[in-house]
Amino acid sequence: MAKFVPAIFLDRDGTINVDHGYVHEIDAFEFIDGVIDAMRELKKMGYALVVVTNQSGIARGKFTEAQFETLTEWMDWSLADRDVDLDGIYYCPHHPQGSIEEFRQVCDCRKPHPGMLISARDFLHIDMAASYMVGDKLEDMQAAAAANVGTKVLVRTGKPVTAEAENAADWVLNSLADLPSAIKKQQK
């Protein structure tokens, strides 16, 4: 029987990197201060790290899937060079009003739907109750709730925090950089 592992599900734009809007080029990708160290610490604490990101810019024709994949590969290698190995990267290229027909659809992977988290759970054998979802928007919290993620963490490094998002979260932190110490404090 497979051993189940706890995970940190991570939104990308506004959580891992500064959200400049439809980030798809290496030059525009800027890691938020402290997140790489935090991710390294979370790995040491025994968590799988799984990126779950809506990328509607693909459906909207702002950038191609190939451009997204090139940037994602660069991000993955940049993190690996700093001793942060991601366990999974899941993305949704769809949008119901997309201008690119192949990606114009209602799907179950676009947050607030839980599809990406469920796929990761099944593939990586994740213990959802012991896991955390970290994101900057209400949709991240809703996806986590729908997937039965144990702790929903809203961060202030992305979109302005709304009261609705705050109410949907279990924790509100200034940044992903603060998560390792928050988890340690809670586990005492």
Curated annotation (Swiss-Prot):
Q: What GO cellular-component annotations does this UniProt entry give?
A: cytoplasm
Binding-site positions, Mg(2+): 11, 13, 136-137
Q: Which GO terms describe its molecular function?
A: D-glycero-beta-D-manno-heptose 1,7-bisphosphate 7-phosphatase activity; magnesium ion binding; zinc ion binding
Point out the annotated site residues (description: Contributes to substrate recognition).
Answer: 110
Q: What class of enzyme is it?
A: hydrolase
- Which biological pathway? Nucleotide-sugar biosynthesis; ADP-L-glycero-beta-D-manno-heptose biosynthesis; ADP-L-glycero-beta-D-manno-heptose from D-glycero-beta-D-manno-heptose 7-phosphate: step 2/4; Bacterial outer membrane biogenesis; LPS core biosynthesis
> What are the catalytic residues?
11, 13
User: What family is this?
Assistant: Belongs to the GmhB family.
Q: What is this protein called?
A: D-glycero-beta-D-manno-heptose-1,7-bisphosphate 7-phosphatase
- Source organism: Salmonella typhimurium (strain LT2 / SGSC1412 / ATCC 700720)
> What does the organism's lineage look like at the top?
Bacteria, Pseudomonadati, Pseudomonadota, Gammaproteobacteria, Enterobacterales
Q: Which gene encodes it?
A: gmhB
